[in-house]
Amino acid sequence: KKHGADVMYTEFISSEGLIRDAAKSIKKLDIYEKERPVGIQIFGSNLESMLKAVEIVESTNPDIIDINFGCPVKKVVCKGAGAGILKDIPLMVKLTKEMVKHSSLPITVKTRLGWDHNSIKIVEVAERLQDVGVAAISIHGRTRAQMYKGNADWLKIAEVKNNTRMKIPIFANGDINSPEKARIIRDELGLDGAMIGRAAIGNPWFFNQVKAYLKDKTILANPSIKERVEAARSHLKMAIDWKGETLGILETCLLYTSDAADDWSSG
């Protein structure tokens, strides 16, 4: 948020974990006022569990509830959740409809183009989600079968936006890893914005770089070594304040020794 993100979402949270009062899931509901507007993202495939999760989430007073229908990871998909629900669009629509009905907050959806190349029906799916009341849809430009291979197909996302029936905001996700690509998303494809994930890992400055370029094509310099070190120290302090010394230090060390952190440290 400090570096320009307009809206933030939490790490996705299992609806089953929430209703079992799993400590790890409950901890992810923590919201700091300086983060607003912030959405809490949940996943699941059982209607009763999802509705109970909505009640729990609303008690923490977020600004938005987001449903993750896009995670391609096997342990999520095998339970029919995340991108797994793309094999059962009627269930996807039913879950969404009931969550909208039972929530006082805006409900948004994150999803993918389809389960595989032969089942891409994102234009129809987006219409149905809009019809049951979602406030916005973010679409990752790959199928579940692709995982993160190949290139995100932004043109298929643009087809959703260009559908004259669509009135809600449509956001692109996937491979938006430069300010120039963000400009294409907005100015050439006419989408309402971008949901950025992997490009910001270890690089929180990315949001302000994108916003400066979208405003007048200003190219902001990459952060200096001093700024990077200060950011790392800040991350460590916040992690310790949030999760305690042992877990905070461990998770921060894991972050900064990951492949994503290697990319960040090399600029």
Feature roles, as predicted:
Residues V54-I65, F69, K74, K79, ...:
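Alpha/beta enzyme core
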Residues D259-G267:
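Single conserved hydrophobic/aromatic residue that forms the stacking wall/gate
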